[in-house]
């Protein structure tokens, strides 16, 4: 976890950071276990939430989400975390992709069309006024 925090900021824009041997996160002899919340695998799962931060950030601060991994009040620099564009898992491996320079954050401009919102009216606030 600390290695990721120290080195991800040095990954070039559009580059990838690979974490291997994640099976150790599940093996008790290596300090792991499926129910342990402090493993590298659990930290990387939280990075998937960081990618989707625009949808939950009003409810919780990103540092609060990651706090269990930084005891004693240590605070990671979250600046480079904003550049995470994807977190992909493979057998015993995770690939974290850094946003390319100049790439649009998230999915791009939100476009909502239509005038009815039968479940929630919230999306109508984002209704596009441009013509297609």
Regions found by a protein language model. Give the residues of each.
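C-terminal substrate-binding/active-site "lid" region of AdoMet-derived donor-dependent transferases
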Residues: 1-132
């Amino acid at each position: 976890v600390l290695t990721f925090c120290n080195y991800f900021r040095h990954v070039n824009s559009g580059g990838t950071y690979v974490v291997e041997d994640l099976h150790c996160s599940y093996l008790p002899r290596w300090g792991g276990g499926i129910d342990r919340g402090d493993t590298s695998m659990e930290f990387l799962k939280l990075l998937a939430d960081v990618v989707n931060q625009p949808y939950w950030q009003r409810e919780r601060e990103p540092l609060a989400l990651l706090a269990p991994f930084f005891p004693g009040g240590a605070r990671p620099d979250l600046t480079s975390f904003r550049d995470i564009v994807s977190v992909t898992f493979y057998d015993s491996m995770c690939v974290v992709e850094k946003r390319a320079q100049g790439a649009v954050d998230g999915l791009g401009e939100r476009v909502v069309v239509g005038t009815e919102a039968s479940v929630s009216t919230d999306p109508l606030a984002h209704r596009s006024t441009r013509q297609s």
